[in-house]
């Protein structure tokens, strides 16, 4: 259990993308580079420990509070992987049953590999809160999402400094690129879960390509780098065939 650092929620305007989206595995290597060292493959079990804190759904992953869904967790600092696990899901096997939670935060006070800090309500679904610290095992799984992925343009963004966050993704997102002068440009992901282009992505429409952990890619075109806007994409990553 720990003291949570909250990031204030923001009102978002949602704009539907009127166009182009493509989904598929990259066959020519152009969508490669999706491997992140230390990231568990989907379905691979990890022995671990669960604790709980006063989670709101917000945190270091820079998501808004989600009072309607608090099946959320903070990842131990070693497996947070500079926010690469943000928005991904894990299934936990606890004494009282199984539960799928979404990673929304990091836990700097959780030094051990496998440690997950859950919301109070999530913890109570699979273990007795009186126990406080419970040994479990868990595995990364696909998130049970509906609809397409979405893209949040961070407040303060413009054509000269652009930060994009991918939301509502079924699989872990490992890479984001944008199209510049006919070529895809890899964008660095920051620890607060935004892909940031410090020189900006330019004026007008922005072509985006995101890559999932398994190599699938999605392409969308955003109307522009409008500060604090949420744009709906055109498609979603396919669920893995193994049922994870």
Model-inferred region functions:
Residues 1-12:
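Bacterial N-terminal signal peptides that target proteins for export
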Residues 16-17, 54:
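Residue-level signal for mature regions of secreted extracellular proteins and peptides
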Residues 19-22:
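C-terminal motif of bacterial Sec signal peptides marking the signal peptidase cleavage site
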Residues 24-214, 219-244:
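Secreted/periplasmic proteins
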């Amino acid at each position: 259990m720990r003291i949570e650092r909250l990031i204030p929620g923001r009102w978002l305007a949602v704009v539907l993308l009127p166009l182009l989206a493509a989904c598929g595995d990259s066959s020519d290597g152009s969508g490669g580079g999706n491997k992140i060292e230390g990231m568990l493959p989907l379905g691979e079990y990890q022995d671990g420990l669960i604790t709980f804190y006063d989670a709101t759904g917000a945190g270091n992953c820079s998501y808004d509070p989600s009072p309607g869904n608090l099946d959320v967790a903070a990842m131990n600092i070693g497996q947070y992987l500079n926010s690469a696990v943000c928005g991904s899901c894990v299934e936990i096997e606890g004494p009282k049953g199984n539960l799928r939670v979404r990673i929304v935060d990091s836990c700097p006070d959780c030094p051990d590999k496998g440690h997950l800090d859950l919301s109070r309500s999530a913890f109570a679904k699979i273990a007795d809160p009186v126990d406080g610290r419970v040994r479990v095992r868990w595995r990364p799984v696909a998130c049970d999402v509906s609809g397409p992925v979405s893209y949040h343009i961070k407040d303060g963004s413009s054509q000269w400094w652009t930060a994009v966050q991918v939301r509502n993704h079924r699989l872990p997102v490992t890479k984001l690129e944008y199209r510049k002068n006919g070529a895809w440009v890899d964008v660095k992901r920051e620890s607060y879960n935004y892909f940031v282009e410090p020189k900006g992505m330019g004026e007008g429409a922005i072509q985006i390509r995101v890559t999932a952990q398994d190599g699938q890619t999605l392409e969308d075109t955003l109307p522009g780098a409008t500060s604090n806007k949420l744009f709906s994409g055109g498609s979603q990553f396919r669920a893995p065939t193994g049922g994870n």
